[in-house]
Amino acid sequence: MSSNLAASRRSSSSSSVAAAAAAKRPAVGEGGGGGGGKAAAGAAAAKKRVALSNISNVAAGGGAPGKAGNAKLNLAASAAPVKKGSLASGRNVGTNRASAVKSASAKPAPAISRHESATQKESVLPPKVPSIVPTAALAPVTVPCSSFVSPMHSGDSVSVDETMSTCDSMKSPEFEYIDNGDSSSVLGSLQRRANENLRISEDRDVEETKWKKDAPSPMEIDQICDVDNNYEDPQLCATLASDIYMHLREAETRKRPSTDFMETIQKDVNPSMRAILIDWLVEVAEEYRLVPDTLYLTVNYIDRYLSGNEINRQRLQLLGVACMLIAAKYEEICAPQVEEFCYITDNTYFRDEVLEMEASVLNYLKFEVTAPTAKCFLRRFVRVAQVSDEDPALHLEFLANYVAELSLLEYNLLSYPPSLVAASAIFLAKFILQPTKHPWNSTLAHYTQYKSSELSDCVKALHRLFSVGPGSNLPAIREKYTQHKYKFVAKKPCPPSIPTEFFRDATC
């Protein structure tokens, strides 16, 4: 009985050990893929990446093949040598990233025999061009990546190799791109296919440069320079410059004199008398060293007053000194006294007469003494012209000021707004300094809001004034700008005519 009890104990013990061993040992399937195959498939599924897709511009369905294609190709080409040097780090990134995405839903890779592995590897389709997906625009999508299968050194079956089938991922700050394989031959194939699909030619930049060089354009097509980029100088008002200019353009339409007051209002005064008065006021401004804005405002007040008030020629000089007194009080730090203006007229008018005319002018103007003049716009336009100009800065500024002051003498130029006169003065000054170069460019057209064709008539009128020469009977302005402090710009030779192609707008 004791022997039977021992036998039963041994039988039960062996059966329990066998049952425990059977419970611990994984079951092997008929195809050779058991628990080990599922574990390998699970590891492979954890490393699966986005499926490769065709990114050729034809398949993408839009966009020029030049710019976008170039950007994509450069990223793919530059990523290749980086990947070869940091394959392990890239694989770790892919494993950690893919583990957070669904991996259980992927099917295990089918097991193949050792002698079939070489044949199946050769029959695998060549890899497609790596997809470059902007991470900010598209969310990553994971799909099974079962195109590459490599043999494993175990028994009669093989599974996905750890070093051959891992879909390595690399990341850059802006783009997420997907690549397969780690051999130099695969990388070379990817680059060749990318070049073929994207149709990128090495001569594209050369052809584009040649097209730009041979493009016919009467005006220089260039980029617009940023003039208002100095935010440290409070006098430039960089943040408000554009708004100030638009306000001045609107204000000049409201505070302009009539263009025909000599024909409709004045009976005893003609344009020649007006020119003589202004020429004399230029001498007065030089005598008292008044700023140019005072002279421009004086002429503005005179023309606005003459636009609505008839006056005889004996009081025209009185009107001139009264308007200059008002302008000096507005512009100058230390304006001349009334007695000085009486003295400058050789005491032709008494103090009370000057003050009476001053009150009459202010009442007619309704005390609206702030008016945009050509000098206001010229100061802005000179700065714009000097940003990308090779001409000497002072020569351009003085020559433009000289042309603008000549415009004060001409009654017919009242038909042009002050901003147009200032832009035309810049145009003519640049032409005089460089007769063979187009005076206008994109930067001037942008900031002045005038095309070269719009300046044609005014520029030609200023050109005639400039070409009169020193023989004119109104010499004050010319003598002023023949001084050394103004770089003798009044003596600059001027071509007899301006080419018509300079007044053609740019064609892009």
Swiss-Prot record:
CDD domains: CYCLIN_AtCycA-like_rpt2, CYCLIN_AtCycA_like_rpt1. GO terms for biological process: cell division; G1/S transition of mitotic cell cycle. Induction: By gibberellin (GA3) and submergence. Keywords: Cell cycle, Cell division, Cyclin, Mitosis. Residues 1-40, 82-125 are annotated as: Disordered. It comes from the Eukaryota. Coiled coil: none annotated. One of its GO terms (molecular function) is cyclin-dependent protein serine/threonine kinase regulator activity. GO terms for cellular component: cyclin-dependent protein kinase holoenzyme complex; cytoplasm; nucleus. Residues 1-28, 98-111 have a biased composition (Low complexity). Residues 29-39 have a biased composition (Gly residues). InterPro entries: Cyclin, Cyclin-like_dom, Cyclin-like_sf, Cyclin_A/B-like, Cyclin_C-dom, Cyclin_N, Cyclins_cyclin-box. The keyword Cell division applies. Expressed in the dividing region of the root cap and root apex. Expressed in the intercalary meristem of internodes and in adventitious roots under submergence conditions. PANTHER family: CYCLINS. Involved in the control of the cell cycle at the G2/M (mitosis) transition. Belongs to the cyclin family. Cyclin AB subfamily. This is Cyclin-A1-1. It comes from Oryza sativa subsp. japonica.
